[in-house]
Amino acid sequence: MIKVDKQLRCKRCYSWIEEDWQLPGGQYYCRACIVFGRNQEGKELYYFPSKTSEIEFPVLKWFGELTPYQAEISEKLLRTYQKQKDSLVHAVTGAGKTEMIYNIVAYVLENKGHVAIASPRVDVCRELFLRMKRDFTCSISLLHAEGEPYDGSPLVIATTHQLLKFYQSFDLVIVDEVDAYPFVGNVMLNHAVEQAKTETGRFIYLTATSTLSLEEQVRLGTLEKHHLARRFHGNPLVLPKFFWQGRLQKSLTRGKLPRPLLY
Protein backbone atom coordinates (compact mmCIF):
# COMPACT_ATOMS: atom_id res chain seq x y z
CA MET A 1 0.00 0.00 0.00
CA ILE A 2 1.09 3.57 -0.62
CA LYS A 3 -0.42 6.78 0.73
CA VAL A 4 -1.41 9.44 -1.81
CA ASP A 5 -3.08 12.65 -0.59
CA LYS A 6 -3.84 11.03 2.79
CA GLN A 7 -5.60 8.07 1.14
CA LEU A 8 -4.27 4.56 0.68
CA ARG A 9 -3.72 3.18 -2.80
CA CYS A 10 -2.90 -0.38 -3.83
CA LYS A 11 0.64 -0.58 -5.16
CA ARG A 12 -0.22 -3.55 -7.38
CA CYS A 13 -3.40 -2.41 -9.16
CA TYR A 14 -3.41 1.31 -8.24
CA SER A 15 -6.99 1.21 -6.94
CA TRP A 16 -8.04 3.59 -4.17
CA ILE A 17 -8.70 1.73 -0.91
CA GLU A 18 -12.25 2.23 0.38
CA GLU A 19 -12.92 2.94 4.05
CA ASP A 20 -14.70 -0.39 4.59
CA TRP A 21 -11.96 -2.53 2.97
CA GLN A 22 -10.65 -3.63 6.36
CA LEU A 23 -9.74 -6.93 7.99
CA PRO A 24 -10.99 -7.81 11.51
CA GLY A 25 -7.64 -6.61 12.85
CA GLY A 26 -8.12 -3.18 11.29
CA GLN A 27 -5.60 -3.51 8.44
CA TYR A 28 -6.71 -2.26 5.06
CA TYR A 29 -6.57 -4.58 2.05
CA CYS A 30 -7.38 -4.28 -1.65
CA ARG A 31 -10.56 -5.92 -2.91
CA ALA A 32 -10.00 -4.82 -6.52
CA CYS A 33 -7.17 -7.29 -7.21
CA ILE A 34 -7.80 -9.87 -4.48
CA VAL A 35 -8.18 -12.60 -7.11
CA PHE A 36 -4.37 -12.41 -7.48
CA GLY A 37 -3.82 -12.84 -3.73
CA ARG A 38 -4.54 -10.52 -0.83
CA ASN A 39 -2.48 -7.33 -0.77
CA GLN A 40 -2.85 -5.69 2.62
CA GLU A 41 -1.49 -2.79 4.61
CA GLY A 42 1.92 -3.49 6.15
CA LYS A 43 2.81 -6.26 3.67
CA GLU A 44 5.39 -5.97 0.89
CA LEU A 45 5.12 -7.04 -2.74
CA TYR A 46 8.08 -8.89 -4.27
CA TYR A 47 8.98 -9.58 -7.88
CA PHE A 48 11.52 -11.69 -9.73
CA PRO A 49 13.49 -10.12 -12.61
CA SER A 50 12.86 -11.64 -16.05
CA LYS A 51 15.41 -14.23 -17.11
CA THR A 52 17.02 -14.36 -20.54
CA SER A 53 15.61 -17.28 -22.53
CA GLU A 54 17.40 -19.31 -25.16
CA ILE A 55 15.64 -19.12 -28.52
CA GLU A 56 16.15 -20.61 -31.96
CA PHE A 57 17.25 -18.41 -34.86
CA PRO A 58 15.35 -17.31 -36.79
CA VAL A 59 12.55 -17.05 -34.24
CA LEU A 60 9.99 -16.24 -36.94
CA LYS A 61 9.02 -19.16 -39.17
CA TRP A 62 6.14 -17.47 -41.00
CA PHE A 63 6.56 -17.70 -44.76
CA GLY A 64 3.67 -15.48 -45.75
CA GLU A 65 4.13 -12.24 -47.66
CA LEU A 66 3.00 -8.80 -46.56
CA THR A 67 1.29 -6.48 -49.00
CA PRO A 68 3.21 -3.26 -49.81
CA TYR A 69 0.90 -1.35 -47.44
CA GLN A 70 1.41 -3.87 -44.62
CA ALA A 71 5.17 -3.97 -45.21
CA GLU A 72 5.34 -0.19 -44.90
CA ILE A 73 3.60 -0.27 -41.50
CA SER A 74 5.80 -3.18 -40.38
CA GLU A 75 8.95 -1.24 -41.24
CA LYS A 76 7.66 1.91 -39.53
CA LEU A 77 6.98 -0.05 -36.33
CA LEU A 78 10.57 -1.27 -36.29
CA ARG A 79 12.02 2.19 -36.92
CA THR A 80 9.77 3.78 -34.28
CA TYR A 81 10.84 1.18 -31.71
CA GLN A 82 14.50 1.79 -32.51
CA LYS A 83 13.89 5.52 -31.98
CA GLN A 84 12.56 4.67 -28.49
CA LYS A 85 9.03 5.88 -29.25
CA ASP A 86 5.60 4.30 -28.80
CA SER A 87 3.34 3.47 -31.76
CA LEU A 88 -0.35 3.48 -32.58
CA VAL A 89 -1.48 1.30 -35.47
CA HIS A 90 -4.88 2.59 -36.58
CA ALA A 91 -5.98 0.09 -39.22
CA VAL A 92 -9.36 -1.14 -40.39
CA THR A 93 -10.68 -4.54 -39.38
CA GLY A 94 -9.20 -7.10 -41.75
CA ALA A 95 -6.08 -5.05 -42.52
CA GLY A 96 -3.80 -7.77 -41.11
CA LYS A 97 -2.60 -6.05 -37.93
CA THR A 98 -1.30 -9.32 -36.45
CA GLU A 99 0.99 -10.04 -39.39
CA MET A 100 2.26 -6.45 -39.32
CA ILE A 101 3.67 -6.90 -35.80
CA TYR A 102 5.54 -10.12 -36.60
CA ASN A 103 8.82 -8.46 -37.60
CA ILE A 104 9.03 -6.17 -34.57
CA VAL A 105 8.19 -9.07 -32.22
CA ALA A 106 10.91 -11.21 -33.84
CA TYR A 107 13.40 -8.32 -33.64
CA VAL A 108 12.89 -7.86 -29.89
CA LEU A 109 13.02 -11.60 -29.16
CA GLU A 110 16.19 -12.11 -31.19
CA ASN A 111 17.81 -9.29 -29.21
CA LYS A 112 17.12 -11.20 -25.98
CA GLY A 113 14.08 -9.12 -25.09
CA HIS A 114 10.68 -10.09 -23.71
CA VAL A 115 7.38 -9.33 -25.45
CA ALA A 116 3.82 -9.22 -24.13
CA ILE A 117 0.80 -9.10 -26.42
CA ALA A 118 -2.27 -8.20 -24.37
CA SER A 119 -5.95 -7.79 -25.12
CA PRO A 120 -9.00 -7.08 -22.95
CA ARG A 121 -10.76 -10.00 -24.65
CA VAL A 122 -9.85 -13.61 -23.86
CA ASP A 123 -11.16 -14.85 -27.23
CA VAL A 124 -8.68 -12.56 -29.00
CA CYS A 125 -5.88 -13.92 -26.78
CA ARG A 126 -6.73 -17.52 -27.61
CA GLU A 127 -6.79 -16.79 -31.34
CA LEU A 128 -3.48 -14.90 -31.16
CA PHE A 129 -1.88 -17.76 -29.23
CA LEU A 130 -2.75 -20.30 -31.92
CA ARG A 131 -1.39 -18.08 -34.68
CA MET A 132 1.81 -17.13 -32.84
CA LYS A 133 2.41 -20.76 -31.82
CA ARG A 134 2.25 -21.68 -35.50
CA ASP A 135 4.51 -18.87 -36.69
CA PHE A 136 7.19 -18.54 -33.96
CA THR A 137 9.74 -21.09 -32.74
CA CYS A 138 10.11 -19.81 -29.15
CA SER A 139 8.02 -20.93 -26.19
CA ILE A 140 4.85 -18.89 -25.69
CA SER A 141 2.70 -18.50 -22.58
CA LEU A 142 -1.06 -17.94 -22.78
CA LEU A 143 -2.33 -16.27 -19.62
CA HIS A 144 -5.97 -15.76 -18.68
CA ALA A 145 -8.23 -16.57 -15.73
CA GLU A 146 -8.41 -20.27 -16.64
CA GLY A 147 -4.91 -20.57 -18.14
CA GLU A 148 -1.72 -22.25 -16.98
CA PRO A 149 0.83 -20.48 -14.70
CA TYR A 150 3.54 -18.38 -16.33
CA ASP A 151 6.57 -20.53 -17.19
CA GLY A 152 9.13 -17.83 -18.02
CA SER A 153 8.48 -17.74 -21.78
CA PRO A 154 9.98 -14.73 -23.61
CA LEU A 155 6.69 -14.22 -25.48
CA VAL A 156 3.50 -13.83 -23.46
CA ILE A 157 -0.05 -13.52 -24.74
CA ALA A 158 -2.37 -12.42 -21.96
CA THR A 159 -5.53 -10.62 -21.01
CA THR A 160 -4.81 -7.13 -19.72
CA HIS A 161 -5.85 -8.26 -16.21
CA GLN A 162 -3.01 -10.81 -16.17
CA LEU A 163 -0.40 -8.08 -16.62
CA LEU A 164 -1.00 -7.19 -12.95
CA LYS A 165 1.29 -10.15 -12.23
CA PHE A 166 4.27 -8.48 -13.92
CA TYR A 167 6.53 -5.59 -12.95
CA GLN A 168 9.01 -4.07 -15.42
CA SER A 169 9.21 -7.36 -17.31
CA PHE A 170 8.70 -6.61 -21.01
CA ASP A 171 10.78 -4.70 -23.53
CA LEU A 172 7.76 -4.45 -25.80
CA VAL A 173 4.10 -4.43 -24.78
CA ILE A 174 1.53 -4.66 -27.58
CA VAL A 175 -2.09 -3.94 -26.66
CA ASP A 176 -4.60 -5.24 -29.20
CA GLU A 177 -8.20 -3.96 -29.22
CA VAL A 178 -7.00 -1.02 -27.11
CA ASP A 179 -10.40 0.65 -27.55
CA ALA A 180 -12.35 -2.33 -26.19
CA TYR A 181 -14.17 -2.83 -22.88
CA PRO A 182 -13.06 -3.21 -20.13
CA PHE A 183 -9.63 -1.71 -20.90
CA VAL A 184 -10.60 1.71 -22.21
CA GLY A 185 -10.99 4.17 -19.35
CA ASN A 186 -10.07 1.54 -16.72
CA VAL A 187 -7.41 2.97 -14.39
CA MET A 188 -6.45 -0.43 -12.96
CA LEU A 189 -5.90 -2.11 -16.33
CA ASN A 190 -4.03 0.86 -17.76
CA HIS A 191 -1.79 0.78 -14.69
CA ALA A 192 -1.23 -2.96 -15.19
CA VAL A 193 -0.03 -2.35 -18.74
CA GLU A 194 2.20 0.55 -17.68
CA GLN A 195 3.94 -1.31 -14.87
CA ALA A 196 4.52 -4.46 -16.96
CA LYS A 197 6.90 -2.56 -19.27
CA THR A 198 10.59 -2.12 -18.48
CA GLU A 199 11.88 1.42 -17.99
CA THR A 200 13.29 1.44 -21.54
CA GLY A 201 10.49 -0.65 -23.07
CA ARG A 202 7.98 0.60 -25.63
CA PHE A 203 4.26 0.29 -26.36
CA ILE A 204 2.42 -0.55 -29.57
CA TYR A 205 -1.34 0.00 -29.54
CA LEU A 206 -3.54 -1.71 -32.15
CA THR A 207 -7.05 -0.53 -32.96
CA ALA A 208 -9.62 -0.18 -35.70
CA THR A 209 -11.35 2.67 -33.85
CA SER A 210 -8.97 5.09 -32.18
CA THR A 211 -9.86 7.00 -29.01
CA LEU A 212 -9.67 10.67 -28.09
CA SER A 213 -6.98 9.87 -25.52
CA LEU A 214 -4.77 8.14 -28.10
CA GLU A 215 -5.27 10.90 -30.65
CA GLU A 216 -4.27 13.47 -28.02
CA GLN A 217 -1.03 11.56 -27.43
CA VAL A 218 -0.41 11.59 -31.18
CA ARG A 219 -1.00 15.34 -31.26
CA LEU A 220 1.42 15.88 -28.38
CA GLY A 221 4.08 13.80 -30.11
CA THR A 222 4.33 11.09 -27.45
CA LEU A 223 2.79 8.51 -29.78
CA GLU A 224 3.61 7.89 -33.44
CA LYS A 225 0.57 6.99 -35.54
CA HIS A 226 0.63 4.54 -38.45
CA HIS A 227 -2.62 4.48 -40.42
CA LEU A 228 -3.88 1.86 -42.88
CA ALA A 229 -7.34 2.16 -44.42
CA ARG A 230 -7.08 -0.90 -46.68
CA ARG A 231 -7.74 -4.55 -45.99
CA PHE A 232 -5.21 -7.28 -46.82
CA HIS A 233 -6.49 -7.60 -50.42
CA GLY A 234 -5.35 -4.03 -51.05
CA ASN A 235 -8.63 -2.67 -52.36
CA PRO A 236 -9.87 0.67 -50.98
CA LEU A 237 -12.75 0.61 -48.53
CA VAL A 238 -16.25 0.83 -49.94
CA LEU A 239 -17.67 4.18 -48.85
CA PRO A 240 -21.44 4.65 -48.47
CA LYS A 241 -23.19 7.15 -50.73
CA PHE A 242 -26.09 9.32 -49.61
CA PHE A 243 -29.11 10.02 -51.77
CA TRP A 244 -32.59 11.32 -51.06
CA GLN A 245 -35.52 9.09 -51.95
CA GLY A 246 -38.80 10.80 -51.20
CA ARG A 247 -41.01 8.07 -52.69
CA LEU A 248 -39.43 5.03 -51.07
CA GLN A 249 -42.62 3.70 -49.47
CA LYS A 250 -44.58 4.18 -52.69
CA SER A 251 -41.95 2.31 -54.72
CA LEU A 252 -41.86 -0.58 -52.25
CA THR A 253 -45.68 -0.82 -52.28
CA ARG A 254 -45.52 -1.22 -56.06
CA GLY A 255 -42.90 -3.96 -55.66
CA LYS A 256 -40.08 -1.89 -57.14
CA LEU A 257 -36.75 -0.64 -55.81
CA PRO A 258 -35.66 2.97 -56.37
CA ARG A 259 -33.23 3.21 -59.28
CA PRO A 260 -30.16 4.28 -57.18
CA LEU A 261 -30.43 1.03 -55.18
CA LEU A 262 -30.07 -1.04 -58.34
CA TYR A 263 -26.53 0.15 -59.08
Segments (PLM) and residue ranges:
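Conserved RecA-like ASCE P-loop NTPase motor core of nucleic-acid helicases/translocases
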Residues: 113-121, 262-263
